């Protein structure tokens, strides 16, 4: 039974990282495209746009890191496997 739980945990860890990277990846691409467009329209606002973009990219990247933490806990500190 532990081997089935271990196999499911590995699959779940892979899905956690993969799915946690899709949303922020799309969001970062969209945010960067809009920032470039905004800088092209108003070059004088480049500093404010860049600062806001970097802060929002950091928040989006945090979601991916949370997925990685879930995956690592499933792999190395799995609560479903009896030790």
Swiss-Prot record:
Gene3D superfamilies: F1F0 ATP synthase subunit C
A GO CC term assigned to this protein in UniProt: proton-transporting two-sector ATPase complex, proton-transporting domain
Positions marked as site (Reversibly protonated during proton transport): 61
Transmembrane segments: 4-24, 57-77
Keyword NAD: no
Matching InterPro entries: ATP_synth_csu_bac/chlpt, ATP_synth_F0_csu, ATP_synth_F0_csu_DDCD_BS, ATP_synth_F0_csu_sf, ATPase_proteolipid_c-like_dom, F/V-ATP_Csub_sf
Topology term for the membrane: Multi-pass membrane protein
Protein purpose: F(1)F(0) ATP synthase produces ATP from ADP in the presence of a proton or sodium gradient. F-type ATPases consist of two structural domains, F(1) containing the extramembraneous catalytic core and F(0) containing the membrane proton channel, linked together by a central stalk and a peripheral stalk. During catalysis, ATP synthesis in the catalytic domain of F(1) is coupled via a rotary mechanism of the central stalk subunits to proton translocation. Key component of the F(0) channel; it plays a direct role in translocation across the membrane. A homomeric c-ring of between 10-14 subunits forms the central stalk rotor element with the F(1) delta and epsilon subunits.
General remark: In plastids the F-type ATPase is also known as CF(1)CF(0).
Assembly: F-type ATPases have 2 components, F(1) - the catalytic core - and F(0) - the membrane proton channel. F(1) has five subunits: alpha(3), beta(3), gamma(1), delta(1), epsilon(1). F(0) has four main subunits: a(1), b(1), b'(1) and c(10-14). The alpha and beta chains form an alternating ring which encloses part of the gamma chain. F(1) is attached to F(0) by a central stalk formed by the gamma and epsilon chains, while a peripheral stalk is formed by the delta, b and b' chains.
UniProt-recorded name of the protein: ATP synthase subunit c, chloroplastic
Organism expressing this protein natively: Galdieria sulphuraria (Red alga)
Lineage: Eukaryota, Rhodophyta, Bangiophyceae, Galdieriales, Galdieriaceae
